[in-house]
Amino acid sequence: MRIALGIQYDGAAFCGWQAQPHGKTVQDALERALGEFACVPLHTTVAGRTDTGVHGLGQVVHFDTDLDRTDFSWVRGTNAFLPSTVSVQWAKPMPDTFHARFAAFERTYYYVLYVHPVRSPMLAGRAGWIHTPLDDDAMRAAAAHLIGEHDFSSFRSSECQSKTPVKHLYQIDVRRSGHFIHFRFRANAFLHHMVRNLMGCLVAVGRGRYPADWLADVLAGRDRTLAAPTFMADGLYLAHVGYPAEFAVPPAQLGSVPWSSVWADLDLPS
C-alpha cells in the first residue's frame, strides 16, 4: 500500500530535508517518528528537497507499507513522535502510480521579505529582512523577463543535481503589505537555490543597483557569476505542490502563518 502525507515544518530547526548521518534533518525526524509508530523502518520519498532554513507548508511525501492503519491514525500516531517543529497534516492512500516527486507537475514557493530600517527579532527565521527601500515596480518589470521556458543556469547552484537547467517559470508575483513584500514563484520545477538566486537578483534591481532589463541579460548569459549573490533562506516557504486531479491530493494548510490572507489574495492554485 502506498501512503501520501502532507508535511509542515519550521526549516530553521533543521539542516534541510535530506537525511544526513548526523540525523538533524526533516527526513530524519519524520522517518524516526514513522518507524516508532509503525514499529518497522519506513523510507519516504519527497516532492522537493528543501535547504537549511527553508520552511515547508505544502510538502508532500509518500512511502510504501503493508500496515493497515486508518488515515488519521497515521497523522496522530506519527505526530506523537515528532518534535514541535514538524507535523503531519494529512494522510491518504494512493495508487501505485502516485509518486510524490515525479507525479507533481508544478511547485509554488513564497518568499516573505520584511523591509524596515531595523530588523525584528520576532521575525527571526520567519522572514527575510532588508533595511533599504525597494522599488516594487522595478522588481515586477525585472521578473517579467524570466517568465516562460528558459535555461536557468545563471540561477543554479554548483551543487544542483538536476538533469537539465531548463525549467518553465509560470509566474512571479510581487505584493506589498505594510512593511512586508510577498513574492510568489510558480514553476513546473526549480533548480537548487533557484528561488533564492532569483530573489537576490530581484532585490538588487529593487535597490536600484541594476535596471530591470539587466535580468534579461543575466538569464541569457547562462552563467551563475553574472547573477547576484544567493539571498537568505529565512523567508522562503514551499507552499504548494501540484498533482493531477485524479490523485485528489489535499490542499496545503496555509492558515498557519500570519500572512496567509495576503497569499490568499494572490490566488494560490488548487
Swiss-Prot record:
Q: Which InterPro entries match?
A: PsdUridine_synth_cat_dom_sf, PsdUridine_synth_TruA, PsdUridine_synth_TruA_a/b_dom, PsdUridine_synth_TruA_C, TruA/RsuA/RluB/E/F_N
Assigned EC number: 5.4.99.12
CDD domains the record matches: PseudoU_synth_EcTruA
Residues annotated as binding substrate are 109
Keyword tRNA processing carried by entry: yes
Q: Keywords for this entry?
A: Isomerase, tRNA processing
Tell me which domain of life the UniProt entry assigns to the organism this sequence originates from.
Bacteria
Q: What protein name is recorded for this chain?
A: tRNA pseudouridine synthase A
Q: What is the lineage of its organism?
A: Bacteria, Pseudomonadati, Pseudomonadota, Betaproteobacteria, Burkholderiales
